[in-house]
From Swiss-Prot:
This is Large ribosomal subunit protein uL10. CDD domains: Ribosomal_L10 (cd05797). It comes from Bordetella pertussis (strain Tohama I / ATCC BAA-589 / NCTC 13251). Gene3D superfamilies: 3.30.70.1730, 6.10.250.290. Belongs to the universal ribosomal protein uL10 family.
Length: 174
């Protein structure tokens, strides 16, 4: 099904809007994937907040022209599926995770703003923790000394109460 000029303009506009919000774009070759597999991949992407779409390469070239993702244009050959996300690691995690279980999906390249990633770069990006994971680790690290201090402060009256209970039990037994 070929698109007419107005439909192409709408697609370019939609993809340009996604690219404007994006922190990462990952492209993968999907040659040989069956519909059921692509449906599972789309569901996973939707749950992770990744915009996943099969597009004509020329339309994507036009959508990324003049943006921080323009270096990716050189990699756009063959049947590709595009993962675009506002989280720098989400698209890489979704596509790399799916590629582990399905060898017909081959990661080709990726891009962060103003930098092109190779296949290995995308896989390395996929192993990084997400922003939420990093924030929770930071918060845990910041709370640990305070929590330990509070437990130490609570231990003094607790020891005193245990001592009183022991004296009471001793007197009750005598």
């Amino acid at each position: 099904m070929s698109l007419n000029r107005q439909e192409k303009a709408v697609v370019i506009e939609e993809v340009s809007a996604q690219v404007a919000k994006a922190q990462s774009i990952v492209i993968a070759e999907y040659r040989g994937l069956d519909v059921a597999s692509v449906t599972v991949l789309r569901k996973t992407a939707r749950e992770s907040g990744v915009y996943l779409r099969v597009l004509k390469n020329t339309l994507v070239r036009r959508a990324v022209a003049g943006t921080a993702f323009e270096p990716l244009s050189e990699q756009l050959t063959g049947p590709l599926i595009y993962g675009i996300s506002a989280d720098p690691v989400a698209a890489a995690k979704v596509l790399a995770g799916f590629a582990k279980s399905n060898d017909k999906l081959v990661i080709k390249a990726g891009s962060l703003p103003n930098s092109l990633l190779t296949q290995d770069g995308v896989k390395a990006l996929a192993t990084m923790p997400s922003r939420e994971e990093l924030l929770s680790k930071l918060l845990g690290t910041m709370q640990a000394p305070i929590a330990q201090f509070v437990r130490t402060l609570n231990e003094v009256p607790t020891k005193f109460a245990r001592g009183l209970a022991a004296v009471r039990d001793q007197k009750a037994a005598a």
